[in-house]
Regions:
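Conserved acidic carboxylate
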Residues: 7-8
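Conserved phosphotransfer cores of two-component systems
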Residues: 42-44, 66-73, 94
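Alpha4 helix (beta4-alpha4-beta5 surface) of REC/receiver domains from two-component response regulators
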Residues: 62, 82-101, 110
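Acidic, metal-coordinating helix/loop segments flanking the phosphotransfer/catalytic sites
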Residues: 30-48, 52-55
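CheY-like receiver
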Residues: 111, 118-131
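Two-component/phosphorelay signaling modules centered on CheY-like receiver
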Residues: 11-29
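Conserved phosphotransfer microenvironments
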Residues: 47-67, 83-87
Length: 131
C-alpha cells in the first residue's frame, strides 16, 4: 500500500489533507513531531512525505537533509505559502520532489493530490529501473 506521511504543525491543515488522501485510497499517517516522522521513514511505512514549514524545534530546511539521510528514495513535497524563491532553490538542491502552496480551495488541494500521485508514479519507475 502507498504510504503517505503528513508532517505539519497546523492541525486543521493536517486533518484536511489526511481526509482527502484517505478518500483517495492512500495509507496516511499524520504527525507534528519530528521524532514520529523519522520513525515512520525508518520503518519504511512512508514513501512520500507532505512537509509543512515548521514543527517542534526544526524548520523544513533543517529536517529535509535528515529525512533524506534516512531514506534517499523518499519523495518530499514541501507545502508552504511564504517561502522565498532562493529558499526553494536550496531545498530543491537538498532533495525535495515538489513545492506546493498551502491549499486554500479545491483547486489547490487538487494540485497537491496530483503531486502526490506523480511522486508515487516516479517512485514506481525508479524501483522498476533498479531491478
Amino acid at each position: 500500500m502507498q504510504g503517505l506521511l503528513i508532517v505539519d504543525e497546523d492541525l486543521v491543515s493536517r486533518k484536511q489533507m489526511a481526509d482527502m488522501f484517505i478518500e483517495s485510497g492512500y495509507n496516511v499517517t499524520v504527525t507534528n513531531s519530528v521524532a514520529s516522522a523519522l520513525y515512520g521513514i525508518l520503518k519504511k511505512t512512508a514513501q512520500v512525505v507532505l512537509l509543512g514549514t515548521k514543527f517542534d524545534e526544526l524548520n523544513a530546511a533543517e529536517l529535509i537533509p535528515l529525512l533524506k539521510q534516512c531514506n534517499q528514495k523518499l519523495s518530499i513535497i514541501l507545502v508552504a505559502a511564504d517561502t522565498s524563491l532562493l529558499r526553494i532553490k536550496k531545498l530543491r538542491a537538498e532533495g525535495i520532489f515538489y513545492h506546493a502552496l498551502k491549499p486554500v480551495d479545491a483547486n489547490d488541494r487538487e494540485e497537491i493530490l496530483q503531486a502526490v500521485e506523480c511522486a508515487f508514479k516516479n517512485m514506481e519507475k525508479l524501483q522498476t529501473a533498479d531491478k
